[in-house]
């Protein structure tokens, strides 16, 4: 089956996601336009790519700004085919969780704010304006041969920060209290302590509440709950365990204490985190004090790394293009105050792997990894492979921004700013799924040939999928016409490339004189 046919088949369930049939057809047409258009991926370029640049374009823009539809419904085809992509009937659903920033330059875009630039150097912090999103991608891999996993995005939730209200009275009061010399901290502190604090206005109280609700970790919890509901709604995935792999920013109390049912979290932890052992059953409590909840202090993750008494276990996992033996140390049933006394954890310390930049060079080592898991009895190969495969979501971010053009649309409506990037991520995810269902995980001869300077790739890249989709759309109308080449243009050029010159003036005068 062609990639175009499979992609069109996956778009058919979108009809139920939109209120009218013509709205669903318009969404499918824009999906093809956003994938096949060149340069910036704008709605106007998508309209031109579908050949409707001479028709009324207002309905295409109203699809994202006014039409009532749920962006989560666009990812339903991924969940419908998820059970067929897993290794077995008991295999867990592995999900990678991360946030990303889409840069914007407009000052009147709803939700755009200043944030830390991830491309800034480590010695100097830079700021940039952009839109924040929290993404979750399902990790699937081939079962018949060792190969890297493929991340299929299933959620792309906007996470705009709360807007701080402007209180003119508080600004004047603060300026009046600091009229003294700012270089005298004692005088300023005395003035600050001598006067009572100004009570918060209702707008400021609402801002503090929204600031907590719109934090990235809180949005991440909402994404996990939405994924669990989507899995429970299908008989093939309702009993499967949801295995979430996140980075250190999500390993905190907010996420660990609000995990949905049948959900396991794997995340990085500080090397100096204070852990505790389990409390013995018969433990005396000091008179007059509160009851103990934790046992003796356990070694920190860094101490576990350097402790030679703990056994070293080698786990077989696929990483960096081949199957490797990764050495780890484990410590089961430890407790962390951020997670609570009722949640036992599994500590996994991954020793740094040695590598050489060239043959015969000095042996270098990477940084160790300190992981915790909310399921102390989880299979170690599954745990470590899930953590290694989390890197695929970073590849999603790169392809979404550079090839799909997520958040490049020049829209200013609050709904369009949030739903247009979600629409683009949904069609990108369906394109990845269509390639797996049509051709499998390997890069076969069906794809367009690679240039001579590129090595053979194990799996097709996103650019390979876009080129193949464009070829299957635009090539059939040109099959009955001769394909032009550079030789055809060269044959049309005259034999004498130089223009014919007029005779010199001296020759002309001599001719006249003769």
Regions found by a protein language model. Give the residues of each.
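Non-membrane alpha-helical segments in proteins
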Residues: 29-32
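Active-site-proximal, Lys/Arg-enriched surface segment
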Residues: 66-184, 331
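Short, flexible loop/turn elements at secondary-structure junctions
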Residues: 64, 98-101, 140, 248-250, ...
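Electropositive nucleic-acid engagement tracts
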Residues: 18, 22-23, 34, 38-115, ...
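Short, glycine/acidic-rich beta->alpha junctions
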Residues: 38, 74, 78, 128, ...
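A residue-level signal for conserved active-site and pocket-lining positions in enzyme catalytic cores
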Residues: 46, 136, 426
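Single, function-defining residue in the core of a domain
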Residues: 1-15, 108-109, 147-151, 155-514
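Short, Lys/Arg-enriched anionic-surface-contact patches
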Residues: 10-26
């Amino acid at each position: 089956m062609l990639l175009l046919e499979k992609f069109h088949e996956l778009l058919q369930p979108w009809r139920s996601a939109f209120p009218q049939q013509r709205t669903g057809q318009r969404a499918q047409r824009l999906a093809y336009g956003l994938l096949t258009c060149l340069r910036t991926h704008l709605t106007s370029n998508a309209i031109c790519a579908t050949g409707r640049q001479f028709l009324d374009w207002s309905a295409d823009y109203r699809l994202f700004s006014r039409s009532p539809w749920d962006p989560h419904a666009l990812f339903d085809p991924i969940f419908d085919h998820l059970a067929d992509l897993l290794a077995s009937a008991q295999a867990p659903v592995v999900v990678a969780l991360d946030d990303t920033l889409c840069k914007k330059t407009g000052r009147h875009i709803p939700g755009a704010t200043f944030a830390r630039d991830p491309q800034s150097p480590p010695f100097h912090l830079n700021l940039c304006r952009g839109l924040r999103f929290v993404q979750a991608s399902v990790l699937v891999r081939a079962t018949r041969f060792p190969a890297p996993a493929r991340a299929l995005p299933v959620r792309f939730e906007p996470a705009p920060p709360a807007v701080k209200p402007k209180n003119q009275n508080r600004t004047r009061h603060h300026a009046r209290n600091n009229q003294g010399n700012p270089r005298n901290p004692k005088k300023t502190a005395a003035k600050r302590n001598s006067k009572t604090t100004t009570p918060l206005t209702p707008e400021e109280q609402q801002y503090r509440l929204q600031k907590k609700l719109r934090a990235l970790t809180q949005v991440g919890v909402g994404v996990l709950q939405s994924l669990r509901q989507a899995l429970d709604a299908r008989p093939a995935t309702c009993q499967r365990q949801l295995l979430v792999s996140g980075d250190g920013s999500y390993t905190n109390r907010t996420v660990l204490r609000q995990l949905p049912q049948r959900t396991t979290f794997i995340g990085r932890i500080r090397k100096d985190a204070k852990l505790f052992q389990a409390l013995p059953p018969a433990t005396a409590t000091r008179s007059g004090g509160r009851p103990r909840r934790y046992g003796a202090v356990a070694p920190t993750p860094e101490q576990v790394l350097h402790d030679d008494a703990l056994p070293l276990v080698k786990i077989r996992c696929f990483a960096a293009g081949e199957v490797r033996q990764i050495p780890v140390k484990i410590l089961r049933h430890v407790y962390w105050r951020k997670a609570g006394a009722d949640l036992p954890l599994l500590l996994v310390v991954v020793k740094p792997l040695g590598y050489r930049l060239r043959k015969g060079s000095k042996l270098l080592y990477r940084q160790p990894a300190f992981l915790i898991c909310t399921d102390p009895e989880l299979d170690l190969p599954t745990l470590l492979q899930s953590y290694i495969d989390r890197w695929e979501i970073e590849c999603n971010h790169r392809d979404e921004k550079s090839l799909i053009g997520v958040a490049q649309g020049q829209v200013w409506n609050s709904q369009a700013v949030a739903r247009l990037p979600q629409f683009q991520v949904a069609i990108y995810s369906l394109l990845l799924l269509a390639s797996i269902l049509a051709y499998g995980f390997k890069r076969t001869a069906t794809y367009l040939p690679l240039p001579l300077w590129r090595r053979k790739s194990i799996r097709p890249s996103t650019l390979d999928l876009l080129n193949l989709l464009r070829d299957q759309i635009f090539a059939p109308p040109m099959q009955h016409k001769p394909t032009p080449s550079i030789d055809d243009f060269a044959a049309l050029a005259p034999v004498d490339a130089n223009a014919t010159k007029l005779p010199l003036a001296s020759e002309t005068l001599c001719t006249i004189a003769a």
